[in-house]
Amino acid sequence: MAKKITGYIKLQIPAGKANPSPPIGPALGQHGVNIMEFCKAFNAKTQGDEGTITPVVITVYADRSFSFITKVPPMSVLIKKAVGIESGSSVPNKNKVGTLTAEQVKEIAVKKMPDMNAASLEAAMRTVEGTARSMGVEIV
């Protein structure tokens, strides 16, 4: 028989830097999960991408065990990494902070596709372009 699920926890944690302090500790603690066990498993799984914010969905079972799935980093993080900027523009329509090529847009769309609900690569690329525009990044 399958384990009974008691809850899901969604967090965004920097890869390789999970520790028991807030927000991770309290979120897992209220579900009775072994916090250190999760931190060690998460840090081991995300070892290669140090510092990149990684969304994770933790499934908590009735016997207080857990499993987790790491997802692709948020689109804004991927765009900032591709352009090489620290943050987006505060006034995206007036101040442009960088440029993205069509090839970079396609690369980000392909990487993000598993977590998106876009039907095609073209639709995913349009989503990436829209996010980039709202951050003040120009598409070339």
UniProtKB/Swiss-Prot annotation:
GO molecular function, one term: large ribosomal subunit rRNA binding
Gene assigned in the entry: rplK
Function of the protein: Forms part of the ribosomal stalk which helps the ribosome interact with GTP-bound translation factors.
Pfam families: Ribosomal_L11, Ribosomal_L11_N
InterPro entries tied to this protein: Ribosomal_uL11, Ribosomal_uL11_bac-typ, Ribosomal_uL11_C, Ribosomal_uL11_C_sf, Ribosomal_uL11_N, Ribosomal_uL11_N_sf
GO biological process: translation
Protein name: Large ribosomal subunit protein uL11
Modifications the protein undergoes after translation, according to the UniProt entry: One or more lysine residues are methylated.
Disulfide bridge map: none
Naturally occurring in which organism (per UniProt): Geobacter metallireducens (strain ATCC 53774 / DSM 7210 / GS-15)
UniProt keyword rRNA-binding present: yes
Subunit (UniProt): Part of the ribosomal stalk of the 50S ribosomal subunit. Interacts with L10 and the large rRNA to form the base of the stalk. L10 forms an elongated spine to which L12 dimers bind in a sequential fashion forming a multimeric L10(L12)X complex.
